[in-house]
Regions:
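Short clusters of hydrophobic/aromatic residues that line enzyme substrate/ligand-binding pockets
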Residues: 18-19, 96, 153
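N-proximal helix/coil linker or "cap" segments that precede and/or mark the start of modular domains
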Residues: 1-9
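Detector for methionine-enriched segments
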Residues: 1, 85-87, 152, 160
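C-terminal cap of thioredoxin/glutaredoxin-like
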Residues: 24-31, 37, 42-47, 103-160
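Homeobox/homeodomain signature
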Residues: 8-9, 80, 86, 118, ...
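Sparse, context-dependent recognition of short Cys/His-centered cofactor- or disulfide-binding micro-motifs
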Residues: 4, 20-23, 57, 70, ...
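A short beta-strand-turn-helix
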Residues: 8-25
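Structural alpha/beta surface segment adjacent to cysteine/selenocysteine redox centers
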Residues: 25-106
Length: 160
C-alpha cells in the first residue's frame, strides 16, 4: 500500500510549464510564489539559463497567499501568459493580494474579467491541486524541491 512519497515522480506532460532554455531533460521544480527560498532558486535558474518545469506546491501553512498566486499564474496560462505572470509574481512577492494580481493581469494585457473568473474556476483549482498532490506523492514536503532525471536533489539554492 502506498503512502506519502511512495509514488514515482510524474513525467513531464503537456500541462507542465517549461521555462528557460530548451533542453531534453529539464529540472522539475516544485515551488511556491511566496517562498523566499523559491525566489532565490528562481533567480538563479533564470540567471544560469537552465531549463525547468514549474509545478505548483503552495505551502499554505507558511505562505497564505501562495495558493492565490498559483491560481493567478494558471489563469494567465489560459490566456497564453503563464511565463509572463510567473516572472511578474516572483518579481514582487510582497504584493500577492487581489488588487495587485488584477494590476499584473492588466499590465500583461489580459482580459481581467476572464482572468478573475478563471483563477476562481474549478478547472484552475484542480490544476493547482494536481501539481500539489503529485508533489506530495513524490515525497515533496517543502519548497523549493527540485528533481533532476527523476531524482530529488538538495533543495536549498546554495546546495544546487
Amino acid at each position: 500500500m502506498g503512502g506519502l512519497g511512495s509514488a514515482p515522480l510524474p513525467p513531464l506532460g503537456p500541462e507542465d510549464h517549461l521555462l528557460g532554455a530548451d533542453e531534453d531533460e529539464p529540472l522539475i521544480v516544485y515551488a511556491d510564489y511566496e517562498c523566499p527560498h523559491c525566489a532565490v532558486l528562481h533567480a538563479r535558474l533564470v540567471r544560469d539559463g537552465g531549463s525547468w518545469a514549474f509545478r505548483h506546491f503552495p505551502v499554505r501553512s507558511k505562505h497564505p497567499r501562495a495558493w492565490a498566486a498559483a491560481c493567478a499564474a494558471e489563469a494567465a496560462a489560459l490566456q497564453g501568459a503563464f511565463r509572463q505572470m510567473h516572472m511578474a509574481l516572483y518579481a514582487d512577492r510582497a504584493r500577492l493580494e487581489d488588487p495587485h494580481l488584477w494590476e499584473r493581469a492588466r499590465a500583461l494585457g489580459l482580459d481581467v474579467e476572464r482572468f478573475d473568473a478563471d483563477r476562481r474556476s474549478d478547472a484552475v483549482l484542480a490544476r493547482v491541486r494536481r501539481d500539489f498532490e503529485s508533489g506530495v506523492r513524490a515525497g515533496v514536503v517543502t519548497t523549493p524541491t527540485v528533481f533532476e532525471r527523476g531524482a530529488m536533489r538538495p533543495s536549498a539554492p546554495d546546495e544546487m
